[in-house]
């Protein structure tokens, strides 16, 4: 059939009113009939429907056409459908070309019907010009590595890893912190059922650690990614812990003796308390191992890592406090350790990104007195009310946390003393701090309304006399049982005010003067509060942009990883074989994060399960007889698919089809025109350009 005279069929889709509402279909049909080699022109309401596809199949089977052009919507979503129709009818599917007259024409010129119709003609003419030169191509098959890398050990990463591992596939779970758990581990309870967060999460963390198909790589980060779908090569940097994890039992003896000078803000408690230079991330940590923060360590007694200890006059070694108390020798500083840690290489077939989120820092909001210790973020409030938090769940104002710590030390010594820290009597919540705000983020952070209501409910139930105000722009409760949850909060006596807070002023006694506006009564409101909680925006986690660069995936305008298609492919990325889920993709609550994680896991398993993968032949190929061996193409390839190899005693470029993604950069740059991009050859593209030039659309040099 390749040697036959092209017999082109043009099939024009109405797409309901999406195309027909702006393009005169009958006029376009008459125009298409005049184009060279066009023998059949048909239109249909929805060409992608079964009856629409049947029109194409029937014409192919009856020998009317041997090339197919469909003028419809985007090839991104519909090209596979029409290729399959051609293949089912016995025609090589690469004898198909698509003309996008919806996205590039009708939608772009909805109110200019004459121009839209004329543009549709030109797009179809260019597609027909290319169709005359199409070549039959064959799909390629490559072996797939049946292993998956999951980046991020929060609730989304945990579920993705478990689903894949339970299906019998090897999973590498990489987490940059010493423990998995993510932000969910910091929460006290979860809405709308008020379940204990740790009670839900901890068993899952333990299951991950004990699963035979999961290799847990905590305190590690992805350093580089090479290869392509089915065969990624990933370099992971395991950071130096300065503690022998093979010996560490997680007893915590070392953390108790770390001197005050080495104490720094505790990241897990969101800076409300301090931790030692040697620390275990949190009580339920998995793995529960100590880590030394080398930047905080003061090298007690001049004890440096990798050196023998100094000795006293009587010959006893002078050890650092953590060394002295460690029962297993895990903190032994004599052992030499590489400060760069260890670099390991992994071969995987698919990658799932579940890197989570961070909360926006309060220091951006000068109008809300961010310098006051009693103005905190909602995530800090989670730690304040948690039994594993800095005050063990006792509600006191953050400015008095040092008093609580002193009281705790005295109690530990057996002293009977009362806690003199101030308890808040009035708490004010401020919603949409940084969200829905053109100065910062225009998007809604989705979970803020519900977690403010949750915290207020928990506090009101535990402390009935507590006076709680919540300033909302709008109350958004669009989930299952969410609105009932909101009504329950109102019934408890929590004061919900529709309106914005204009400013907060710090008072000399560390209380806070809150000035807001009540939109329902149309008057300003003033509240003197002991504690203010800011519902700051959910933001992409630190390192998102750098990780996107390493993976070769896109970032959206809001800073989160961008999905391939919002509705059809919400967990896929534009880089095949790499999936996203959870808050890495955008703000969402725990159920939505879990659902998306399971979807990403399912997509990854569908990819690796066959063991082989079909690749399109739309890749570049070098004609070594024409190649001059200049090597210009090698550094230009963004996928590392081109190498220089020996050919007839000379060096020539060679393209690995398994790595090539068909971007065409090499073909465009080759001065010898020795590189051919199948499906987009020089002749095919030039034919399209010349067709448009004849009609006055473009100029050709």
Swiss-Prot record:
Binding-site list for [4Fe-4S] cluster 2: 627, 630, 633, 670
Binding-site list for FAD: 152-175
Class of this enzyme: oxidoreductase
Reported cofactor(s): [4Fe-4S] cluster; FAD
Predominant place of localization: cytoplasm
Molecular function via GO: 4 iron, 4 sulfur cluster binding; metal ion binding; oxidoreductase activity
Keywords of this entry: 4Fe-4S, Cytoplasm, FAD, Flavoprotein, Iron, Iron-sulfur, Metal-binding, Oxidoreductase, Repeat
Role this protein plays: Has oxidoreductase activity. The Hdl and Mvh subunits may together mediate electron transfer from hydrogen to an unidentified electron acceptor on the cytoplasmic side of the membrane.
PANTHER family: COB--COM HETERODISULFIDE REDUCTASE IRON-SULFUR SUBUNIT A, FERREDOXIN:COB-COM HETERODISULFIDE REDUCTASE SUBUNIT A
Subunit structure: The heterodisulfide reductase is composed of three subunits; HdlA, HdlB and HdlC. It forms a complex with the F420-non-reducing hydrogenase (Mvh), which provides the reducing equivalents to the heterodisulfide reductase.
Sequence similarity: Belongs to the HdrA family.
Protein name: Heterodisulfide reductase subunit A-like protein
Native species: Archaeoglobus profundus (strain DSM 5631 / JCM 9629 / NBRC 100127 / Av18)
Phylogenetic placement of the source organism: Archaea, Methanobacteriati, Methanobacteriota, Archaeoglobi, Archaeoglobales
Name of the coding gene: hdlA
């Amino acid at each position: 059939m390749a040697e036959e005279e092209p017999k082109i069929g043009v099939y024009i889709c109405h797409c309901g009113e999406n195309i027909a509402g702006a393009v005169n279909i009958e006029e376009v049909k008459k125009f298409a009939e005049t184009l060279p080699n066009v023998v059949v022109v048909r239109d249909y309401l929805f060409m992608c429907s079964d009856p629409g596809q049947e029109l194409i199949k029937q014409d192919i089977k009856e020998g009317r056409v041997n090339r197919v052009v469909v003028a419809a919507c985007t090839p991104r979503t519909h090209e596979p459908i029409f290729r399959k129709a051609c293949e089912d009818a016995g025609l090589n599917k690469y004898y198909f070309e698509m003309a996008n007259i919806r996205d590039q024409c009708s939608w772009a010129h909805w109110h200019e019907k004459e121009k839209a119709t004329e543009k549709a003609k030109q797009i179809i003419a260019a597609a027909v010009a290319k169709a005359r030169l199409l070549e039959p191509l064959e799909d390629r098959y490559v072996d797939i590595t049946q292993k998956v890398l999951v980046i991020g050990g929060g609730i989304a990463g945990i579920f993705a890893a478990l689903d894949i591992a339970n299906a019998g596939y090897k999973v590498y779970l990489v987490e940059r912190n010493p423990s998995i758990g993510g932000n969910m581990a910091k929460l006290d309870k979860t809405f709308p059922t008020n379940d204990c967060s740790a009670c839900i999460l901890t068993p899952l963390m333990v299951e991950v650690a004990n699963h035979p198909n999961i290799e847990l790589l905590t305190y590690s980060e992805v350093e580089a990614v090479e290869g392509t779908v089915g065969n990624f090569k990933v370099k992971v940097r395991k950071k130096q812990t300065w503690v022998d994890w093979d010996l560490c039992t997680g007893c915590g003896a070392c953390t108790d003796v770390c001197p005050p000078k080495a104490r720094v803000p505790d990241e897990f408690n969101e800076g409300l308390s301090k931790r030692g230079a040697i620390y275990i991330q949190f009580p339920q940590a998995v793995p529960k191992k100590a880590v030394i923060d080398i930047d905080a360590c003061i090298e007690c007694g001049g004890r440096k890592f990798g050196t023998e200890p100094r000795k006293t006059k009587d010959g006893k070694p002078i050890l650092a406090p953590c060394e002295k108390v460690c029962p297993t020798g895990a903190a032994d500083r004599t052992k030499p350790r590489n400060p760069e840690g260890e670099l390991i290489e992994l071969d995987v077939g698919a990658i799932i990104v579940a890197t989570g989120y961070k909360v926006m820092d309060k220091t951006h909001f000068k109008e809300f007195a961010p310098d006051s210790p009693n103005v905190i973020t909602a995530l800090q409030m989670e730690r304040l009310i948690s039994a594993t938090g800095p005050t063990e769940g006792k509600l006191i104002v953050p400015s008095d946390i040092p008093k609580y710590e002193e009281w705790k030390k005295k109690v530990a010594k057996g002293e009977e003393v009362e806690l003199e820290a101030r308890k808040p009597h009035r708490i004010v919540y401020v919603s949409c701090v940084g969200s829905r705000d053109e100065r910062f983020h225009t998007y809604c952070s989705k979970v803020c309304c519900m977690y403010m209501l949750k915290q207020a409910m928990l506090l009101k139930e535990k402390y009935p006399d507590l006076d709680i105000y919540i300033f909302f722009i709008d109350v958004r409760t669009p989930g299952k049982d969410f609105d009932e949850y909101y009504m329950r909060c109102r019934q408890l006596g929590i004061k919900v005010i529709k309106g914005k807070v204009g400013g907060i002023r710090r008072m000399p006694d560390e209380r806070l003067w809150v000035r807001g506006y009540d939109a329902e009564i149309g008057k300003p409101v003033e509240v003197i509060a002991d504690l203010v909680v800011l519902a700051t925006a959910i933001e992409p986690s630190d390192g998102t942009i750098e990780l996107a660069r390493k993976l070769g995936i896109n970032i959206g305008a809001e800073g989160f990883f961008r999905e391939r298609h919002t509705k059809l492919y919400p967990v896929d990325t534009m880089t095949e074989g790499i999936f996203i889920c959870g808050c890495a993709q955008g703000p969402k609550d725990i159920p939505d994060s879990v659902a998306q994680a399971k979807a990403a896991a399912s997509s990854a398993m569908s990819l690796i399960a066959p063991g082989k993968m079909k690749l399109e032949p739309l890749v570049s190929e070098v004609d070594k007889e024409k190649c001059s061996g200049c090597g210009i193409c090698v550094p230009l390839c963004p996928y590392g698919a081109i190498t220089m190899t020996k050919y007839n005693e000379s060096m020539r470029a060679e393209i690995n089809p398994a790595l090539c993604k068909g971007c065409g950069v090499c073909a465009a740059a080759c001065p010898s025109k020795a590189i051919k991009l199948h499906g987009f050859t020089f002749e095919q593209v030039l034919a399209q350009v010349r067709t448009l030039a004849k009609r006055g659309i473009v100029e050709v040099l």
